[in-house]
Amino acid sequence: MDSLKFISWYETFLGEDGRKVYAETVLDKREMRTVHMFQVSGSEITVEDSILQKDDKIEVIRRVRANGTADTGIEKNGIAFGMEILLGEGKQLRYGIPSCRYSSGQAGKHTYMEERLTAPVIMAYDESARTAVSVARTRPPADTGKEIRKTGDSRYLHKTEVGSLGYEWREGRENILCARWPYEEMEMSVALDAKGTPVQAFYPIDGNAWEMELHYELQQTCDRTFTDGLYHVFTGLAEQFETEGHHIVSLPFTLKEEIICRETSLMRSYREFGGDGAGFFFHFDPRKGYGSEPSGFGTSFNTIPHSTYVHILEYGFTGRQNHTALILARDKGGEWIEKGEQVVDFFLKHCMMENGWVYSLYDLDREEPFFSFGDPDAPKLHYMDYRGAKGNYLRTMTEPVNDVLEYCKWYREQGHVKKQWLEAVMRYADLLVSLQNEDGSWYRAYEPDGTPVFMLEEPWMTEQERERGRKAASAIPIVFLCNLAEYLSEEVYSTDVENTEPAGSKRSVYLRAAVKAGEYVLSGGCREELFQGGTLDNPNVVDKEAAQYAMAGCWHLYEQTGERRFLEGAATAGKQFVTWNYIWNAPVKEGTVLAEKKFRTKGMGAINSIWCGGVVDIYSLFHIRELYLTGRETGDEFMIRMAEWISTAAHQIMSWPGDRMGFADIGMQPEGFGICPQGMDEGMIQKGDIWGTLGWIYSAGIDGVDRYIRELPQAEQKEEK
């Protein structure tokens, strides 16, 4: 740490000669202090830097003051300050930036707004030395104003406390950790447009006096793995922020009451059609009500709203028809048992082929199922545009069939056997087994005859990158196969009509396939500590859901086999999953819905490494049960605490009898929340925006919470209910 070199600089908004270095410091003693003064547009600017070394940590405090005088009659100016820490090594390091980066550094400069980060920290990890150096902003920004800019401006004035963190890798020469206030996003940003125009903000020099104090902490640690290093600094910051007032939101209702509200809305989205059709029309704008188009966001493929959302049924990914039918049958009983059967029967009749291959989308206008990709005439959803072949994704086939299996389990608990449903489930399971690769993986997508589909592959990709992307969804069937093996372990009758094969032998086939898949996940994502490809709208990128599915799959294998290696895999994936969720409350912009409703980011989940935490959603809820259980089994108290934070934060801005939130009914909630702008020059997301909603919000908000509550100690269950 004592060999680190600090370069301090400033840059003005009107300056044409770029940044100006005002200090270069090599840390050679425990405490250093420098003061610099300069004139900018007639205003005197003073910057005082204090550097204090404490064992393995270095505290940096930067105080900036403007004296409140400025030239009049000239164009408004602004200023930005930066700090670079030279690590002195040219080799490629692995960077951990929570919700942004989890892999080896790329050449060039890569910096991110602090409010985009689930924790304002960057870590550089040396995999050969197993050491990490991190820079964190230990007193994160609390206030931000509106950008002073017109459409197209990428350099602009902004009165904000928000800075940026990132890195620059000059290949073969040096690695640099970067901090700037106000923020910049270089060399690309999603804030303005889809082409990635970079942004730079400058604090206004407008004749008013102001002060800004910035606190950073550098830390060097020795950690066995990259994930351990990032988790180490992440959890440490979480503890610090908790003591400094970054608390989780307080809800005006219990989790049980939250479930009741959501189920009220879900029931009102149900309708029947044709002679045998039934489903939930749960894709809508909560501000406009049932039957409306969901409000928009952008993906790699399509931008919604799109009129087709009002006449399609979705059975997997962002809409779980069979799952919501089960929820209401289980919780409401009565007429919802018969209605639920109608939903599932329609799906099995119209969407499953004889070989077990599954359509997960049905078009009411055309009265037929349709492919998730490949059909140019099919309705447009946000996750499909590939034209090279017609087929469906592994995830969107597995989820609806697993939901039918869960339904079978529930019926058996009531003393009934849905044999035809179970036979359909096993047809799909047999298809999975037949499609499984020798290494235990599956491909991301398949045609109806089982031909794999490889999509979104760029010419510059290495073969390893292609293979990783093709097989990125391999963790997804594990939970299903474990559930089926568990179900069959209690069967005493034949489940194979043709071969009269005992349930026990089928159980071993499915469990063996799950174990093989788990071994692939352990040797791939867990060993490489890189989880990607969980979602379908921005595939082949590192994302939150990939880590979730790997954690959940490994946990279910641990439950089935008792093998420690799967618990260790769940812990590795779980640690990365944790870092996708905010541990601090990023500032919200006045005049927005988020400000009006006192929205807090702590406990909310980022989505993927494109948007990072710039937009958050509630879908960490899907597997907080597995996160909680992994934490309990491994003695990781922070996993347990994060599960609790997620279970609370995810219900913000949900309409309830005490506050309709401006929505059409109770139990409605936005699909997403804008923490940073995303494509704001293209009419997409402004900071403070809300949008949506898609139907999987009911699956996450009801069943994700219910599964978690059921695992809590009895005393805590009573408190939640």
Give the label of every model feature segment.
Residues I7-E16, R224, Y231-L313, E341-Q342, ...:
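Low-complexity, Ser/Thr/Pro/Gly-enriched N-terminal "stalk/linker" regions
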Residues N322-I337, E399-V417, E465, I476-R507, ...:
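Well-ordered alpha-helical scaffold segments within catalytic/enzyme domains
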Residues R262-F280, L435, E501-V509, K516-G534, ...:
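Non-catalytic carbohydrate-binding regions of carbohydrate-active enzymes
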Residues G374-G388, K409-Y493, E501-S508, E559, ...:
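Active-site lining segments of carbohydrate-active enzymes
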Residues F6-G15, T25-D28, T34-S41, T46-E217:
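Beta-strand/loop-rich accessory regions of lumenal/periplasmic or secreted enzymes
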Residues P252-M267, R271, A325, I337-C351, ...:
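Hydrophobic core segments within long, regular secondary-structure runs in both alpha-
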Residues D276-L313, V358-Y393, S441-A472, L530-G553, ...:
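Carbohydrate-binding/catalytic loop surfaces
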Residues N302-H311, G316-E354, K380-R395, E399-V401, ...:
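Aromatic- and glycine-enriched glycan-recognition loops and surfaces
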